[in-house]
From Swiss-Prot:
This is N-(5'-phosphoribosyl)anthranilate isomerase. The keyword Amino-acid biosynthesis applies. It is an enzyme of class 5 (isomerase). It catalyses: N-(5-phospho-beta-D-ribosyl)anthranilate = 1-(2-carboxyphenylamino)-1-deoxy-D-ribulose 5-phosphate. Keywords: Amino-acid biosynthesis, Aromatic amino acid biosynthesis, Isomerase, Tryptophan biosynthesis. PANTHER family: N-(5'-PHOSPHORIBOSYL)ANTHRANILATE ISOMERASE (PTHR42894:SF1). It holds the Pfam family PRAI. GO terms for molecular function: phosphoribosylanthranilate isomerase activity. Pathway: Amino-acid biosynthesis; L-tryptophan biosynthesis; L-tryptophan from chorismate: step 3/5.
Length: 212
């Protein structure tokens, strides 16, 4: 089970996630209240990698983008040493080839658009799907639960990450019902809009226990 803590903006929250056993950290470069500068992201990435190495493992750093150009995504990925990118907007499937060999995580929301259908049938080793909730005018981090029934149906055909309204309290049920490759959380480990150390630890522990 891959566990991704998304929307990390502070070094101490990143280190808590690493210490608790997170596999991925998401750094948001798209305009939002969780947006981070390239400089801060590079600093957090360096600290997280150092902490992970001290525990004999690795941490995967993912940059989150919304409708950004391929050139800008590549520039930021290079500057921060990102391992992969998450495309949370309306990016066309040609981005998959353009961003290789970076890991590409594409958010899908079952909006039944032609563009999303192209991603759903796209099959490349470096591309992973992330199922999120469909919220009009919102590109993620809204705390709304995704369609677990449709996610479970998709998970039977290909591996996926599950996002959308996950919390320490419901992640075990989500894993049992959907059987995803990974889970992604942002607002579910926050208190008053700020990452909460206790909730980060509780979420990771609950996800690990459910995946055993």
């Amino acid at each position: 089970m891959i566990i991704k803590i998304c929307g990390v903006r502070a070094r101490d929250h990143a280190l808590t996630a690493v210490d608790a056993g997170a596999d991925m950290l998401g750094l948001v470069f798209a305009p939002s209240r969780r947006q981070i500068t390239v400089e801060d992201a590079a600093s957090i990435a360096e600290a997280a990698r150092f902490a992970a190495r001290g525990r004999g493992r690795a941490i995967t750093l993912i940059g989150v983008f919304v409708n950004e150009t391929v050139e800008r995504i590549r520039d930021i990925a290079s500057s921060c040493g990102l391992d992969g990118v998450q495309l949370s907007g309306d990016e066309p499937v040609i981005y998959a080839d353009a961003l290789a060999p970076l890991l590409v995580i594409k958010a899908v929301r079952f909006d039944d658009s032609a563009q999303e259908r192209a991603w759903l049938i796209h099959d490349q080793a470096h591309v992973q799907l992330l199922v999120d909730a469909r919220v009009p005018g919102n590109y993620g981090g809204a705390g709304v639960v995704a369609d677990w029934e449709r996610a479970a149906e998709l998970a039977r055909r290909r591996s996926l990450m599950l996002a959308g309204g996950l919390t320490p309290e419901n992640v075990a049920d989500a894993i049992t019902r959907v059987r995803p490759w990974g889970v992604d959380v942002s607002s579910g480990v926050e208190s008053n809009g700020v990452k909460d150390h206790g909730k980060i630890r509780a979420f990771i522990a609950a996800a690990r226990a459910a995946a055993r």
